[in-house]
């Protein structure tokens, strides 16, 4: 079982509510303080006594999820937003006063996260092959969740993702997150519940075209602030090119000859065996289709998912069957780009 002593989603349960005041209960494993009318969560190292992190809940925290039993949904509302007075009333309780209380209900658990900051992973596979994961229980993961990147042949069987006792959130973001993998990805007979984002997310990577170095060579870049820091192309890989405006494919598949990576700058110069078509800078993206997997998801249950049950973006064959979806806030299955 994978557990966290102090999960990095910050949960506040509504235990009392009136027109101008709400009392919230915070799980026993989450340390916090109220100072200068600010609510700050933190976790201390048992070795150095220094904080691993601090997070001050504020009105800018928009990435919140309300857990109302198994009904879950994203919200812009926050326990601390518009609170003119915040007071610690017990070891695990906080009172917030408002001109008008936000429309939470008694029993609601409001789960907050550090906005867009996903600086790590709960579990991480990179450049691995023939991995088989079986009969694991995951109570919580930080960052991207369980991330597999540039791997080949992954199997996940009889896994259970559920929050630990006393908590409502099982992952800071996605549960199983597959980015740029090849061969197959098989996810079978597993249970997914209460993440802060998607249950399963399978996708490749688009690198933006910066400039042509010559007729066979292009400089590409990672643009998304949450992506980069790894080698995305290898000699012999097959690549497709898409227009950024409508994601239509350009004719042809291009074969990687060699690469020159600048990991820190999130750029790569790729030499291809074929001549490249004429392209305007920043108007096209390149995808390594060799690192798109065949996907199988079967016999799984999905419950209390605030976003998508399965988000699938691969141009290989996908088989999704025999699954059960309940209380999914967005599409149960969303397939993008490659249909």
What spans do the regions from the language model cover?
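Ser/Thr/Gly-rich low-complexity blocks that favor extended beta-strand/coil architectures
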Residues: 2-20, 27-87, 228-263
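Surface-exposed loop/turn segments connecting beta-strands in extracellular beta-rich domains
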Residues: 5, 119, 128, 139-143, ...
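Short "repeat-start/strand-capping" segments in structured domains, especially the N-termini
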Residues: 128-132, 149-155, 181-186, 293-296, ...
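Small/polar beta-strand repeat architecture
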Residues: 68-119, 250-252, 258-295, 303-304
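Conserved small/polar residues in nucleotide/adenosyl-binding loops
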Residues: 337-339
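Short glycine/acidic-rich loop motifs that flank beta-strands on beta-rich extracellular proteins
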Residues: 120-122, 142-147, 164-174, 196-202, ...
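Right-handed parallel beta-helix/beta-spiral solenoid domain characteristic of secreted/periplasmic
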Residues: 1-18, 105-118, 134-138
């Amino acid at each position: 079982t994978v557990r966290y002593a102090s999960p990095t989603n910050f949960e506040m349960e509504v235990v009392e509510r009136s027109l101008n005041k709400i009392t919230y209960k915070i799980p026993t494993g989450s340390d916090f303080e109220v100072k200068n009318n600010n609510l700050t969560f933190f976790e201390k190292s048992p070795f150095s006594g220094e904080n691993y992190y601090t997070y001050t809940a504020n009105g800018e925290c928009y990435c919140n999820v309300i857990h109302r039993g198994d009904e879950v949904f994203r919200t812009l509302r926050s326990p601390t937003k518009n609170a003119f007075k915040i007071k610690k009333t017990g070891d695990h309780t906080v009172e917030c006063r408002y001109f008008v209380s936000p429309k939470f209900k008694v029993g609601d658990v409001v789960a907050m996260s550090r906005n867009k900051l996903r600086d790590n992973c709960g579990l991480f596979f990179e450049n691995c092959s023939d991995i088989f994961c079986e009969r694991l229980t995951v109570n919580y993961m930080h960052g991207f969740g369980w991330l597999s990147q540039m791997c080949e042949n992954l199997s996940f069987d009889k896994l259970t993702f559920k929050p630990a006792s006393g908590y409502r959130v099982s992952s800071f973001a996605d549960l199983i997150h597959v980015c740029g993998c090849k061969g197959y990805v098989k996810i079978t007979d597993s249970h997914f519940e209460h993440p802060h984002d998607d249950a399963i997310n399978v996708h490749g990577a688009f690198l933006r075209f910066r400039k042509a170095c010559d007729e066979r060579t292009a400089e590409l870049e990672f643009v998304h602030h949450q992506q980069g820091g790894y080698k995305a192309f290898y000699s012999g890989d097959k690549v497709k090119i898409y227009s950024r405006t409508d994601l239509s494919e350009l004719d042809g598949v291009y074969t990687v000859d060699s690469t020159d990576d600048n990991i820190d700058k999130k750029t790569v110069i790729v030499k291809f065996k074929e001549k490249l078509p004429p392209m305007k800078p920043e108007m096209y993206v390149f995808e390594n289709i060799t690192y798109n997997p065949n996907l199988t998801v079967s016999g799984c249950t999905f419950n209390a998912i605030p976003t998508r049950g399965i988000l699938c973006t691969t141009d290989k064959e996908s088989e999704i069957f025999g699954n059960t979806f309940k209380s999914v806030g967005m599409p149960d299955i969303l397939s993008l780009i490659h249909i």
